[in-house]
Amino acid sequence: MSTKDPHRLPHEKGFHISWDQIHRDSRALAWRLDGQGPDEGAWRAVVAITRGGMAPAMIVSRELDIRTVDTISVKSYHHQAQGQAQVLKAPDAGLMGDGTGILVIDDLVDSGKTLELVREMYPNAHFATVYAKPKGRPMVDTFITEVSQDTWIFFPWDMALQYVEPYRGTD
């Protein structure tokens, strides 16, 4: 008879991302986006989807020397439960227009609901994520790594280092 651990996440797989790995993968995303903008290869601005997209957006904007950076705040998760996506804060309307020349960056596309909402607002923006799951993949234009739908990604900003008991216990 198995008992369910109430403290265990409902996801079957966990993928732990370190700060070093998100930095490397975000730089790889920048390299993939370099020269792909509509203005002789250049991008006008970067818009980070908060909060997860902020670290990758900072790295991409640095690597591509893009000085204009804004945010869009979309809430679609409460802890690990996904809900209805809603915009809490939109970027500057004058900057955005229809999204032409704008890189919208997030850490992950999961179901695609967040990107779908933002894409409706800015249909000509280029959507880039570091990681992508199969359900959300059609919503993203560029990504670095695909993971299975049942994988839960643990980002470094959500983690803390702590002592863990040895597997076999202690004396």
Swiss-Prot record:
A GO MF term: guanine phosphoribosyltransferase activity
Residues the record lists as binding Mg(2+): D107
Quaternary structure, from the entry: Homotetramer.
Record key words, sorted: Cell inner membrane, Cell membrane, Glycosyltransferase, Magnesium, Membrane, Metal-binding, Purine salvage, Transferase
Domain of life: Bacteria
Encoding gene per record: gpt
Known function: Purine salvage pathway enzyme that catalyzes the transfer of the ribosyl-5-phosphate group from 5-phospho-alpha-D-ribose 1-diphosphate (PRPP) to the N9 position of the 6-oxopurines guanine and xanthine to form the corresponding ribonucleotides GMP (guanosine 5'-monophosphate) and XMP (xanthosine 5'-monophosphate), with the release of PPi. To a lesser extent, also acts on hypoxanthine.
Pfam families, alphabetized: Pribosyltran
CDD domains per the UniProt record, alphabetical: PRTases_typeI
Family named by the database record: Belongs to the purine/pyrimidine phosphoribosyltransferase family. XGPT subfamily.
GO term, biological process aspect, one: XMP salvage
PROSITE patterns xref list: PUR_PYR_PR_TRANSFER (PS00103)
Binding site for 5-phospho-alpha-D-ribose 1-diphosphate: R51, G52, D106, D107, L108, V109, D110, S111, G112, K113, T114
Membrane topology: Peripheral membrane protein
Annotated xanthine binding sites: D110, I153
Compartments it resides in: Cell inner membrane
Cofactor(s) the record lists: Mg(2+)
Organism ancestry: Bacteria, Pseudomonadati, Pseudomonadota, Alphaproteobacteria, Rhodobacterales
Binding site residues for GMP: D110, S111, G112, K113, T114, W152, I153
GO cellular component, one term: plasma membrane
Name of the protein described by the UniProt record: Xanthine-guanine phosphoribosyltransferase
Residues noted as binding guanine in the record, renumbered to the chain: D110, I153
